[in-house]
A protein has these predicted regions:
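Surface-exposed loop/edge segments in extracytoplasmic proteins
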Residues: 87-93
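Extracellular/periplasmic metallocenter environments
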Residues: 23-35, 41, 48, 55, ...
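Short, well-ordered turn and helix-capping elements at secondary-structure junctions
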Residues: 51-53, 60, 85-87, 99
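Sec-dependent bacterial lipoprotein signal peptides
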Residues: 1-24
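Beta-strand signatures of extracellular beta-sandwich domains
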Residues: 80-84
């Protein structure tokens, strides 16, 4: 009886520790990391992107040049949104399932590729474009 009670406490401790680690790793917003500085001023437009099981919806978006906001809403797991080719250094949105993350960004005219940088997600189709005019 005493031995079973001890095992329960050990199991509870392991589960509690694992929950803490997973929660810390998969927390809500990524906030763009420490190297990214958001532009000041109001956003002209908010580009909303839903990240799901290996997809972005919409796959492509249009935005005006200047300060815009990008919002990632995640469903079905942890997802990120970064710009390919280092075009926006340090910018990173990260959201766990059912959560969202949002940052402002100052984009010049052009076509930007975005993708999820979680291993295997981009290769499985989690890539899109933002066209700025």
């Amino acid at each position: 009886m005493e031995r079973e009670r001890g095992r329960r406490w050990i199991r509870a401790g392991v589960i509690g520790f694992a929950t803490t680690v997973v929660t810390a790793a998969c927390g809500g917003g990524g906030g763009g990391g420490s190297s990214y500085k958001q532009p000041s001023g109001p956003a002209q437009k908010t580009i909303e992107v839903k990240g799901g099981n290996f997809f972005y919806d919409p796959k492509s978006s249009d935005a005006p040049a200047g300060v815009d906001a990008i919002k990632l809403e995640s469903e079905g797991g942890l997802h990120t949104l970064v710009f390919a080719g280092g075009k926006v250094p340090g910018f990173k949105l990260q959201a766990a399932s059912g959560k969202s993350d949002e940052l402002k960004v100052n984009l010049k005219p052009g076509k930007y590729t975005i993708y999820c940088d979680i291993p295997g997600h981009r290769e499985a189709g989690m890539e899109g474009t933002i066209t700025v005019t």
